[in-house]
Regions:
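Non-catalytic connector elements of ABC transporters
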Residues: 2-11, 15-17, 23-24, 31, ...
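ABC ATPase nucleotide-binding domain helices that frame the ATP-binding cleft
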Residues: 23-26, 125
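The short alpha-helix immediately C-terminal to the Walker A/P-loop
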Residues: 27-28, 186
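Catalytic "switch" loops of ABC-type ATPases
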Residues: 32, 62-63, 67-75, 176
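Conserved ABC transporter NBD signature motif
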Residues: 38-50
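ABC ATPase NBD coupling module
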Residues: 47-64, 88, 208
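ABC ATPase nucleotide-binding domains
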Residues: 77-212
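C-terminal boundary and immediately downstream tail of ABC-type ATPase nucleotide-binding domains
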Residues: 206-229, 257
């Protein structure tokens, strides 16, 4: 694994496919895994430095780790789980536990065991236990991966509310672009153990720069290009020649992408700069229709997603003759 990043933001997302090294990055920060080389520094405190032989033990790092399954002790009640790591006197411990139970909306659940709690209640208990340590950093390891879409959205909202007054750094890893976009100020994209793109979350989504980053941020249509000059590229897979009037195509551009919602239907006169619509398949969803348009033989289908109001126009006028690429929506990708 070779991951390097520096950030001054307080809400950081790490986005990557399964098995790319996201969780290993968190475990290295927490001290669960020991890297072979490199440095880990948080708020000026060196947690690990291979060259100087520094390796702080996990319990000395002031790092809270929220595991995917929350890792609550099954034979302990909510209040016992929260207070397990507290080292002060009994009176201070009871006061601290009561404050955390109230803050994380666990009132009335103090005597229950984890098996009697809902997923959201288990998550809040695990977060309260982390907060009892007063960590400088909280690490969230795919906290919603086992939940269905509705519960993920609801629990993400709850998590953001619970952490709204936490002044430390929170790092969340996920393969869900929606979770990362909603949660993060800054995002690191990881591919095969390498950090390939770091930046403000909106900037990375608008200009992912690399094919992998484009795919992970939701771009369905990506193809290699032949750069003809500083304004023109030819896309063999789509049989499209695009000329950019307001943008310059650098020599580093090896591919382009266009998001499935950004295409414009064209009826009548078409040009070489448009994707010809000949054969297609479609799938209906509650709020949109997805078209999969056949391109050149051996190439992946081209994706065009339309909202319900556009679907109504298509019902009336039929499929367009072509799809146009808005210049400002085309993603320039370096490979």
């Amino acid at each position: 694994m070779d991951v390097a990043f520096k950030s001054e933001k307080k809400r950081i997302g790490i986005l990557g496919a399964s098995g790319c090294g996201k969780s290993l990055t968190l475990k290295s920060i927490a001290g669960i895994e020991r890297p072979e080389k490199g440095r880990i520094v948080i708020d000026g405190v060196t947690l690990f430095d291979a060259g100087k032989k520094i390796f702080l033990k996990p319990q000395k790092r002031k790092v809270g780790y929220l595991f995917q399954n929350y890792a609550l002790f099954p034979n302990m009640t909510v209040e016992q789980n929260i207070g397990i790591g507290f080292t002060g006197n009994k009176e201070d411990k009871q006061k601290m536990v009561e404050q955390l139970i109230h803050h994380f909306q666990l009132d009335g659940l103090e005597k229950l065991y984890p098996s009697k709690l809902s997923g959201g209640q288990q998550q809040r208990t695990a977060l309260a236990r982390i907060m009892a340590y007063e960590p400088d950093v909280i690490l969230l390891d795919e906290p919603f991966s086992a939940l269905d879409a509705y519960l993920r959205e609801r629990m993400l909202t709850e998590l953001m509310e619970m952490l709204s007054d936490y002044e430390g750094t929170v790092i969340m890893v996920s393969h869900s672009r929606d979770e990362i976009y909603s949660f993060s100020e800054e995002v690191l994209v990881i591919e095969d153990g390498h950090g390939i793109r770091l930046g403000p979350v909106k900037e990375v989504f608008n200009a992912p720069r690399y094919k992998t980053a484009a795919r992970l941020t939701g771009c369905k249509n990506i193809a290699d290009v032949y750069r003809m000059d500083a304004q023109t590229v030819y896309v063999k897979d789509w049989d499209v020649q695009l000329t950019f009037k307001r943008r310059t195509v650098s020599e580093n551009v090896k591919a382009i992408g266009i998001r499935a919602h950004d295409l414009i239907p064209v009826y009548g006169t078409i040009s070489d700069a448009m994707l010809k619509v000949k054969e297609w398949k479609s799938v209906d969803y509650p709020f949109e229709r997805k078209y999969f348009i056949q391109c050149e033989p051996g190439c992946e289908d081209f994706c065009w997603f339309v909202q319900r109001e556009v679907s109504a126009i298509l019902e009336e006028k039929g499929m367009p003759d072509a799809l146009a690429f808005p210049e400002e929506k085309v993603l320039f990708l370096e490979g």
